[in-house]
């Protein structure tokens, strides 16, 4: 951690130099966050925190925000929610009630975000979250909740369209596609499932398998046995990091060959490094990729962000989209304070409702329900151990390798 902090400080030192002499004159805007440093969401919790910290230091190095002629620097106070929703809610209440923090960042994951939102609403505390995609979070009428990422029902809808188009090119009827699905029984994965179910109806497809993962996410061999016996055309797995790792490991053990295999949470599950043969050719949905045509004045292009983050955090061989979207949340806060020209919670909340900006992460335009409906998901394929955007075709950086044929 000390090495990481030192590298980041060095990377930003030149940018910070012009304002260093006046740093002591700046006020502080404290943001609060309960983020998973331990427990089942720890991998993406660390990604989230690193994204927040990187953006805070970058924005502070450029002068932070100026409100009514006075400069302010961002600071984030963290607690470890231990991947426990009840604990997350307790800690957010502590941040607001005891630590007197008036502006919040979200935790990682829909279950934890679902737990904290009643607290932030109770205290009328604005929260900008970048790591919870469940559609249900935006149907409760919350007025202080703002999410910037594509909602989870969108994660694999492009996959169904892709599979249908490929079937047509092969002279096949898309309605005959044999789709096998298995999901973790949690808010996020059930939203992913619903999005798929809605999309397959457009092509009159009835999935041949629609199973649930066991609670411990340790074994899906029974499901994979059925997949092989039924000769599925498309295989879908959504089970966060542990589910993705289990799927990759057991597909390798069982030599599963399916023309299209899609898995969520590929990066944080480290399936490329841990299961290089089994993961080859898998399709992975993502909210962001460094090849995307998106930019802003702070981070430059998506590729610029990718390169600068890797220089500061060299332990990252691939920059997960969780890092990028966490950093984008800090940009949203800066934009809101700049437009509100106030530290008043209600004035800042009102500014958040009018968010409409372009960032290295993509466009962020907040809708009345607090979501960012213009954000879409793209599909990447693991090719030669690298993630390559392959769908939609108009943004693809590489040709889709189809059908998938893993060399076990």
Model-derived features: positions:
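Stable alpha-helical elements in mature extracytoplasmic
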Residues: 44, 48-55, 88-92, 100, ...
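Extracellular/periplasmic periplasmic-binding protein-like sensory domains
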Residues: 251-327, 338, 387, 393-408
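Short, low-complexity disordered leader/linker segments with a strong preference
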Residues: 1-30, 406-408
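Beta-alpha junction/loop-to-helix N-cap segments that form part of ligand/metal-binding clefts
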Residues: 30, 43-50, 65-139, 148-151, ...
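Extracytoplasmic "Venus flytrap"
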Residues: 26-53, 79-85, 108-111, 182-191, ...
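Extracytoplasmic ligand/sensor domains, especially the bilobed periplasmic-binding protein
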Residues: 101-209, 259-284
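Signal peptide-proximal N-terminal region
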Residues: 24-26, 50-76, 168-170, 174, ...
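Segments of small-molecule ligand-sensing domains
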Residues: 309-324, 330-390
């Amino acid at each position: 951690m000390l090495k990481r902090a030192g590298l980041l400080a060095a990377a930003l030192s030149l940018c910070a130099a012009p304002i260093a002499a006046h740093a002591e004159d700046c006020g502080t805007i404290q943001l609060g966050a309960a983020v998973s440093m331990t427990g089942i969401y720890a991998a993406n919790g660390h990604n989230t925190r690193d994204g927040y910290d990187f953006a805070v230091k970058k924005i502070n190095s450029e002068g932070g925000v100026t409100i009514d002629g006075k400069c302010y620097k961002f600071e984030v106070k963290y607690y470890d929610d231990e991947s426990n929703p009840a604990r997350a809610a307790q800690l957010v209440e502590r941040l607001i009630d005891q630590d007197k923090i008036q502006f919040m960042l979200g935790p990682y994951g829909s279950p934890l975000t679902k737990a904290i939102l009643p607290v932030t609403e109770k205290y009328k505390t604005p929260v900008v979250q970048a790591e919870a995609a469940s559609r249900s979070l935006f149907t409760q009428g919350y007025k202080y909740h703002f999410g910037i990422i594509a909602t989870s029902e969108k994660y694999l809808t492009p996959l169904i369209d892709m599979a249908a188009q490929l079937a047509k090119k092969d002279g096949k009827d898309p309605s005959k596609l044999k789709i096998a699905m298995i999901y973790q029984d949690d808010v996020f994965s059930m939203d992913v499932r619903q999005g798929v179910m809605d999309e397959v109806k457009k092509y009159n497809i009835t999935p041949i398998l629609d199973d649930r993962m066991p609670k411990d996410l340790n074994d899906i061999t029974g499901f994979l046995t059925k997949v092989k016996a039924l000769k599925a055309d498309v295989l879908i797995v959504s089970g966060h990091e542990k589910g993705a790792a289990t799927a990759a490991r057991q597909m390798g053990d069982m030599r599963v060959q399916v023309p299209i295999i899609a898995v969520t949470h590929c990066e944080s599950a480290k399936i490329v490094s841990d299961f290089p043969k089994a993961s080859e050719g898998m399709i992975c949905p993502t909210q962001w990729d460094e090849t995307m045509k998106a930019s802003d004045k702070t981070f430059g292009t998506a590729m610029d962000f990718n390169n600068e983050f890797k220089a500061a955090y060299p332990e990252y061989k691939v920059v997960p989209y969780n890092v990028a979207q966490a950093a984008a949340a800090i940009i949203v806060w800066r934009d809101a304070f700049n437009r509100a020209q106030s530290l008043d919670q209600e004035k800042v909340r009102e500014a958040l409702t009018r968010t409409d900006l372009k960032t290295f992460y993509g466009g962020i335009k907040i809708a009345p329900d607090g979501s960012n409906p213009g954000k879409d998901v793209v599909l990447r394929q693991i090719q030669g151990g690298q993630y390559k955007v392959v769908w939609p075709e108009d943004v693809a950086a590489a040709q889709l390798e189809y059908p998938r044929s893993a060399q076990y």
